[in-house]
Curated annotation (Swiss-Prot):
Catalytic activity: Ca(2+)(in) + ATP + H2O = Ca(2+)(out) + ADP + phosphate + H(+)
Classification via SUPFAM superfamilies: Calcium ATPase, transduction domain A, Calcium ATPase, transmembrane domain M, HAD-like, Metal cation-transporting ATPase, ATP-binding domain N
Active-site residue list: D473
Entry membrane topology: Multi-pass membrane protein
Activity regulation as described: Down-regulated by YWHAE.
Reported function: ATP-driven Ca(2+) ion pump involved in the maintenance of basal intracellular Ca(2+) levels at the presynaptic terminals. Uses ATP as an energy source to transport cytosolic Ca(2+) ions across the plasma membrane to the extracellular compartment. May counter-transport protons, but the mechanism and the stoichiometry of this Ca(2+)/H(+) exchange remains to be established.
Protein name per Swiss-Prot or TrEMBL: Plasma membrane calcium-transporting ATPase 3
Biased composition range(s): Polar residues: 1-20
Known EC number: 7.2.2.10
InterPro entries membership: ATP_Ca_trans_C, ATPase_P-typ_cation-transptr_C, ATPase_P-typ_cation-transptr_N, ATPase_P-typ_cyto_dom_N, ATPase_P-typ_P_site, ATPase_P-typ_TM_dom_sf, ATPase_P-typ_transduc_dom_A_sf, HAD-like_sf
Region (Disordered): 1-23, 298-355, 1166-1186
Transmembrane spans: 98-118, 156-176, 365-384, 418-435, 850-869, 880-900, 921-943, 962-983, 1003-1024, 1035-1056
Length: 1220
């Protein structure tokens, strides 16, 4: 049989090697022997098997297993195997305890500085700078000593320590809940991943962790191999081993050439059967993980940030990051055939920047920079005004000279002014934003699980809210994927229902039963129903299940045929793939000849038919004219009824004329048509309504299918994707390519832009067509807004399109492991309606963040202006240090929790998507922010300057330093908090709706937080005393504060009345970053790709990491210094009490990147290194040409970037290589 792709081993070991040597636990192989064997490849491996075991059957005997029956499924035997050979599981790293996480949080440099600052401020509260009593220094040096000074200083130090404790606890809790959520998600995915094995002669689906050495495993297209093994039998098997070897080409496997299969590799084509020889830490991938894990722990001690040590491990292709902040690990290629050049190329690809899909992150980045700039300008102006005010008053108005002894006092003032400037900057940054984004995404992801959406990449959740187009598969997503044959053409007769067996000639019936039974995957079966009265269970490929069901409907059974001709007796198999669109199987006949059975798409296979069986079962000629008649009279009517048409044919080869089996075109030709069947796959009843919802929501749904154009059009009409009378396009793949390519065969974006807006159905399409369409829509700039595209996929070849899409949906039931790995969200029920729910949740996330932004920016605008004017006019702040701590730390945190957990409503689907370019802060939101800021500032300044007259109380404006808290400033603080509390209710609506209470009781978290905050505020005001700079208020004063707060709701209605369109002066904010703002260095990254979307979003990632994190870190560091410096230099009795305002410890959640990716958590340093890496060289400058290597390039890069999720050492081996 030579080079046959389908090779099976004849089990005849050599006589001298038939003696099985009993070894470990009664088995004939030791663990070390098997590990050594699996390190070999190709001819070397075959030679070793031959020398040591005779052949694969000898190896099976040594392992006490049967190549056809498998293990006996005996619990004791399985347990014994686990003890001797290990279990298919990598021992998990122990989760960190809460105290360990607290200790880690304390290691933060900023917090250490804050801790030191707190201790120093406690010590310095008793320190008096020299020269403060000197008359020569003028009135700046103050007057009488205050007894409460030491106490007040102690309170300031305690306030800083309190803020540190709060930050540490919140950070530790965040990390703990993140780790818990990740482990929960990981274990759920692990339980769902199963693999097919043969035990007791029965095909069983077992969890991958239950695989043992000696199991006989069925390998099929799309599988991710969970263990190492040796092939027993293979049909046209091709494996992608790039994850281990760095070899990008698919490797053909056969029992007589290269039988070694490795865990973590993907089956790209064909099927087969293997005996498992190594599992868990003893498999090739497991050995690498173990080595890396050991190196990782040492490395972790050296470098907490997880930077990778140079050396052997850097030449890796696959990167597997440990989720819990551990070291990023890289797999070293095993014996790569390509040598150093290949290795270098793969390394560059592995280090290439990961595609960042999040539209939201780009907008938040831009907004953060805008806010930062505004804050910087305000703070600079504040410092300049204060310094000028002080210098003019001291040295010009009072005519004093600079004395050496007064220098510490003057320096103290200058430091104080600088601190005020920094405070204005700090107040300007919305610290609660990272937390709001984290909470909103984490909350949504958890809830989306109940809606059958398993989110693998967090940013996909919010990106889905912006989706403008969905490219959906037909089978299983829009349809039920329970297929049945309802029409057939047999023996010159078109049957509209299942024919009676007696109506068919025995020869036709016999040929049909054999063609279907043999030329189908033997793993595909029809099993009895689980419950009485239920439908029979379909296991395996659904189209083949329909054909096997047809055999049963004809009162025949396929199982006896399969027993008569077992799988290892099949001579040659041409497996189905997206290029062939057919499957063919060759068997040897008793007379020494061969018979080929073939099945496939009718219009493709009929072209290869030269004969057809007539009503008597005899051959008659089948000319092109006959074929055209058949297409017109049989196939088109079936297709117009929405049926998939499959042709079943055969061909006989006489004993003397064995063809060249590798010449497929010659072998699968000159066929005789047995039958054409029409298979029905009913539309899911809930799909038409779901598509209507999408269309109302401004989302265009397109169907991309491999089916016949008429079938696709009929199903699209049933679903509501196309409506009668609409101007739309339904194209076949060939026509689509003709329209979008130029004379040279290159894709032109201009041509694509003429096709895709009207395209609704793409039939007879290949995965490349799907990728081309998705890329073309994403890259297009023709419409009013850039498109955000979601794609569904289930096949191995859908990987490139799923990766390219903004959001890739894989099928949880029908999807292959490869498709799941490439996806962002897995639909656990394979249902289109779940995509609509994902849109709803995505829009909800976007709105939640916008709500929080509206609330937070109102607080920030007011606080900045109050701080600025307070410092410049009264040289004091109405809001004291600990009060600011309460507002910034507690209210922002609580508000982010309250606004980020709003449940989604159907009304979210009644508006158009935002798209890529829509700003984060709309003009309506800007109107709300500025409108409420005007109201709040008017109230606060009125209270500040005339409040004491209105309430008939003492003014707090000119109170000496460290004097008891005044009622005046307490009223201002209380009113400020009340206004924020009621404005939080206003912030629930961001599109100008009037009823801000709509659905408020459906969110118990919001109600609890608002009431809880109000309760704590009462405690602070009435019993806070000196630590909170509060004086108890009377009932009347409380009622006035509440009255002003409720005024926010009334004022909100006034603002809603003003039409936004009339306010031309309002600008939107928070657009996505534009190309013109990018640096040359950033533009150089990924230069070979003509992909503006990726370029734009990659820049968002760079800015986010480099910009916001650094700004926030610098702010926190300066703030920490501010607190300690101030306490050291504070003049004891300055009438200008800026002191209380300045030592405001703020709550800042640690870096955005640290908090957001609960699932896809990547270390900042690691990301920065990746982002600075040079772009990978383009394999082919013409990215649009047919041969541009789209698939290979995308796939190779993915293994470096997508294994983030898998790398938790707790995952079983099957998930070592996937993002799952």
């Amino acid at each position: 049989m030579g080079d046959m792709a389908n090779s099976s081993i004849e089990f005849h070991p050599k006589p001298q090697q038939q003696r099985d040597v009993p070894q470990a636990g009664g088995f004939g192989c030791t663990l070390a022997e098997l590990r050594t064997l699996m390190e070999l490849r190709g001819a070397e491996a075959l030679q070793k098997i031959e020398e040591a075991y005779g052949d694969v059957s000898g190896l099976c005997r040594r392992l006490k297993t049967s190549p056809t029956e498998g293990l006996a499924d005996n619990t004791n035997d399985l347990e014994k195997r686990r003890q001797i050979y290990g279990q298919n599981f990598i021992p998990p790293k122990q989760p960190k305890t809460f105290l360990q996480l607290v200790w880690e949080a304390l290691q933060d440099v900023t917090l250490i500085i804050l801790e030191v600052a707190a201790i120093v401020s406690l010590g310095l509260s008793f320190y008096a700078p020299p020269g403060e009593e000197s008359e020569a220094c003028g009135n700046v040096s103050g007057g009488a000593e205050d007894e409460g000074e030491a106490e007040a200083g102690w309170i300031e130090g305690a306030a800083i320590l309190l803020s540190v404790i709060c930050v540490v606890l919140v950070t530790a809790f965040n990390d703990w809940s993140k780790e818990k959520q990740f482990r929960g998600l990981q274990s759920r995915i692990e339980q769902e991943q199963k693999f097919t094995v043969i035990r007791n002669g029965q095909l069983l689906q077992v969890p991958v962790a239950a695989l043992v050495v000696g199991d006989i495993a069925q390998v099929k297209y799309g599988d991710l191999l969970p263990a190492d093994g040796v092939l027993i039998q293979a049909n046209d098997l091709k494996i992608d081993e790039s994850s281990l070897t760095g070899e990008s080409d698919h490797v053909r496997k056969s029992a007589d050439k290269d039988p070694m299969l490795l865990s973590g590799t993907h089956v790209m084509e064909g099927s087969g059967r293997m005996v498992v020889t190594a599992v868990g830490v003893n498999s090739q991938t497991g050995i690498i993980f173990t080595l890396l894990g050991a190196g990782g722990e040492e490395e972790e001690k050296k470098d907490k940030k997880g930077k990778q040590q140079d050396g052997a491990m850097e030449s890796s292709q696959t990167k597997a990051k440990k989720q819990d902040g551990a070291v990023a690990m890289e797999m070293q290629p095993l014996k790569s055939a390509e040598g150093g050049e290949m290795e270098e190329r793969e390394k560059k690809k592995a280090n290439a920047p990961k595609k960042e899909k999040s539209v939201l992150q780009g907008k938040l980045t831009k907004l953060a920079v805008q806010i930062g700039k505004a804050g910087l300008v305000m703070s600079a102006i504040t410092v300049i005004i204060l310094v000028l005010y002080f210098v003019i008053e001291t040295f010009v108005v009072e005519g004093r000279t600079w004395l050496a002894e007064c220098t510490p006092v003057y320096v103290q003032y200058f430091v104080k002014f600088f601190i005020i400037g920094v405070t204005v900057l700090v107040v300007a940054v919305p610290e609660g934003l990272p937390l709001a984004v984290t909470i909103s995404l984490a909350y949504s992801v958890k809830k989306m699980m109940k809606d059958n959406n398993l989110v693998r990449h967090l940013d996909a959740c919010e990106t889905m809210g912006n989706a403008t187009a969905i490219c959906s598969d037909k089978t299983g997503t829009l349809t039920t994927n329970r297929m049945t044959v309802v029409q057939s053409y047999l023996g010159d007769t078109h049957y509209k229902e299942i024919p009676a067996p007696s109506a068919l000639t025995p020869k036709i019936l016999d040929l049909l039963v054999h063609a279907i039974s043999i030329n189908s995957a033997y793993t595909t079966k029809i099993l009895p129903p689980e419950k009485e009265g239920a439908l029979p269970r379909q296991v395996g490929n659904k189209t083949e299940c329909a054909l096997l069901g047809f055999v049963l409907d004809l009162k025949r059974d396929f199982q006896p045929v399969r027993e008569q001709i077992p799988e290892d007796k099949l001579y040659k198999v041409y497996t189905f793939n997206s290029v062939r669109k057919s499957m063919s199987t060759v068997i040897r006949m008793p007379d020494g000849g061969f018979r080929l059975f073939s099945k496939g798409a009718s219009e493709i296979l009929l072209k290869k038919c030269t004969n057809i069986l007539n009503s008597n079962g005899e051959l008659r000629g089948f000319r092109p004219r006959d074929r055209d008649d058949m297409v017109r009279k049989i196939i088109e009517p079936m297709a117009c009824d929405g049926l998939r048409t499959i042709c079943i044919a055969y061909r006989d080869f006489s004993a003397g004329q064995e063809p060249d089996w590798d010449n497929e075109n010659e072998v699968v030709g000159d066929l005789t048509c047995i039958a054409v069947v029409g298979i029905e796959d009913p539309v899911r009843p809930e799909v038409p309504e779901a598509i209507r919802k999408c269309q109302r929501a401004g989302i265009t749904v397109r169907m991309v299918t491999g089916d016949n154009i008429n079938t696709a059009r009929a199903i699209a009409a049933k679903c509501g994707i196309i409506q009668p009378g609409e101007d739309f396009l339904c194209l076949e793949g060939k026509e689509f390519n003709r329209r979008i390519r130029n004379e040279k065969g290159e894709i032109e974006q201009e041509r694509l832009d003429k096709v895709w807006p009207k395209l609704r159905v793409l039939a007879r399409s290949s995965p490349t067509d799907k990728h081309t369409l998705v890329k073309g829509i994403i890259d297009s700039t023709t419409g009013e807004q850039r498109q955000v595209v979601a794609v569904t996929g289930d096949g191995t070849n859908d990987g490139p399109a799923l990766k390219k899409a903004d959001v890739g949906f894989a099928m949880g039931i029908a999807g292959t492991d490869v498709a799941k790995e490439a996806s962002d969200i897995i639909l656990t029920d394979d249902n289109f309606t779940s995509i609509v729910k994902a849109v709803m949740w995505g829009r909800n996330v976007y709105d939640s963040i916008s709500k929080f932004l509206q609330f937070q920016l109102t607080v920030n605008v007011v606080a900045v202006i109050v701080a600025f004017t307070g410092a410049c006019i009264t040289q004091d702040s109405p809001l004291k240090a600990v009060q600011m701590l309460w507002v910034n730390l507690i209210m922002d945190t609580f508000a982010s929790l309250a606004l980020a957990t709003e449940p989604p409503t159907e009304s979210l689907l009644l508006r158009k998507p935002y798209g890529r370019d829509k700003p984060l802060i709309s003009r309506t939101m800007m109107k709300n922010i500025l409108g409420h800021a005007v109201y709040q500032l008017a109230i606060i300044f009125t209270l500040l300057f005339v409040g004491e007259l209105f309430f008939d109380i003492d003014s707090g404006r000119n109170a000496p330093l460290h004097s008891p808290p005044s009622e005046h400033y307490t009223i201002i603080f209380n009113t400020f908090v009340m206004m924020q509390l009621f404005n939080e209710i206003n912030a629930r609506k961001i599109h100008g709706e009037r009823n801000v209470f709509d659905g408020i009781f459906s969110n118990p978290i919001f109600c609890t937080i608002v009431l809880g905050t109000f309760g704590i505020q009462i405690v602070i005001v009435q019993f806070g005393g000196k630590p909170f700079s509060c004086s108890p208020l009377s009932t009347e004063q409380w009622l006035w504060c509440l009255f002003v707060g409720v005024g926010e709701l009334v004022w909100g209605q006034v603002i809603a009345t003003i039409p936004t369109s009339q306010l031309k002066c309002l600008k939107e904010a928070g657009h996505g970053p534009g190309k013109d703002e990018m640096t040359d260095e950033e533009l150089a990254e990924g230069e070979e790709e003509i992909d503006h979307a990726e370029r734009e979003l990659r820049r968002g990632q760079i800015l986010w990491f480099r910009g916001l994190n650094r700004i926030q870190t610098q702010i926190r560091v300066v703030k920490a210094f501010r607190s300690s410096l101030y306490e050291g230099l504070e003049k004891p009795e300055s009438k200008t009490s800026i002191h209380n305002f300045m030592a405001t410890p703020e709550f800042l959640i640690n870096d955005y990147t640290h908090n957001i990716p609960l699932i896809d958590d990547t270390d900042v340093d690691e990301n920065e290194e990746r982002l600075r890496a040079p772009p990978p060289p383009s394999p082919n400058q013409n990215n649009n040409a047919i041969d541009s290597g789209i698939y290979l390039t995308t796939h190779v890069t993915k293994s470096a970037t997508s294994s983030v999720f898998s790398s938790s050492p707790g995952s079983p081996l099957h998930s070592v290589e996937t993002s799952l």
